[in-house]
């Protein structure tokens, strides 16, 4: 099952992003002021938690559950926006171009901050800044850039096919639903078969829930303060999804690659929380429409 999912999920994500980029004019991809506040929250919190973890390790050398919990929170904050966030944002009436722009910017920040801060917590002689930087770029950007280029080629070279794609407005959302079902199935299996103690699992679960609540709340608060976008709901929806809906598969990979392996489970827990919230938001939005 996991092997099949590892092949199918990237294809689904690529297709979702391709369909999303088909609906965005290249000139619409530009930064907004609220982007910088969200970057400050994600990057600043990650740096502060990294320093805190380093101080604890310096004072109490060795592996402990406390460092695992702090590292789990680090992952929850620095994890970039989910590639499917644009699909949910569009369903909720948000600005797809804005959240897509933020997704690109936050991935650049992650590529710089993670290699800079992780050595404070987990020094590794064979993991230089540029090695870690290249690992992250190779993991993230092909799945972001290739659908973008493919969509723009179709837009300008195959306009009839492009119009045909636009005639199926809910196709990306239906693909997201399939992708979500697969992700939840894999997540539940990983949690059930985890060898971690019940107490540590409960702690990681609580940390992931708290981080999820804080980020959705902060994003909506900041987005709302920047007013209304013509043709969309106010920025609260877009900013909330930008910082709250995470690329949890990437968080799991970062946990295994850069931090304590136990932290990788936090991506699974976060996936449950943000998808429960997304499902509730979509249900409420559809009920009010």
Language model: regions and residue ranges:
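Alpha-helical transmembrane segments of multi-pass small-molecule/ion transporters
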Residues: 1-289
């Amino acid at each position: 099952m996991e092997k099949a999912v590892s092949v199918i999920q990237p294809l689904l994500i690529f297709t979702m992003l391709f369909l999303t980029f088909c609906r965005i004019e290249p000139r619409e991809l530009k930064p907004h002021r609220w982007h910088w506040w969200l970057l400050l929250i994600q990057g600043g919190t990650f740096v502060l938690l990294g320093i805190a973890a380093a101080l604890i390790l310096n004072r109490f050398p060795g592996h402990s559950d406390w460092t695992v919990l702090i590292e789990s929170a680090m992952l929850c904050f620095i994890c970039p926006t989910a590639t499917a966030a644009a699909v949910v944002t569009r369903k909720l009436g948000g600005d797809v171009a804005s959240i897509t722009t933020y997704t690109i910017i936050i991935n650049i920040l992650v590529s710089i901050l993670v290699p800079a801060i992780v050595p404070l917590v987990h020094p590794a002689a064979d993991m230089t800044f540029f090695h870690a930087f290249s690992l992250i770029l190779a993991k993230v950007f092909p799945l972001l850039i290739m659908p973008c280029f493919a969509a723009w080629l179709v837009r300008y070279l195959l306009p009839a096919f492009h119009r045909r794609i636009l005639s199926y407005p809910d196709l990306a959302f239906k693909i997201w639903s399939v992708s979500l079902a697969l992700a939840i199935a894999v997540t539940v299996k990983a949690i059930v078969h985890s060898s971690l103690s019940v107490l540590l699992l409960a702690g990681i679960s609580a940390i992931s829930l708290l981080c999820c609540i804080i980020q959705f709340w902060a994003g909506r608060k900041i987005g709302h303060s920047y007013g209304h976008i013509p043709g969309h709901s106010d920025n609260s929806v877009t900013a909330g999804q930008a910082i709250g809906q995470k690329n949890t598969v990437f968080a799991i990979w970062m946990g295994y690659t850069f931090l304590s392996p136990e932290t990788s489970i936090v991506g699974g827990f976060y996936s449950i929380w943000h998808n429960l919230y997304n499902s509730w938001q979509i249900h409420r939005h559809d009920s009010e429409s």
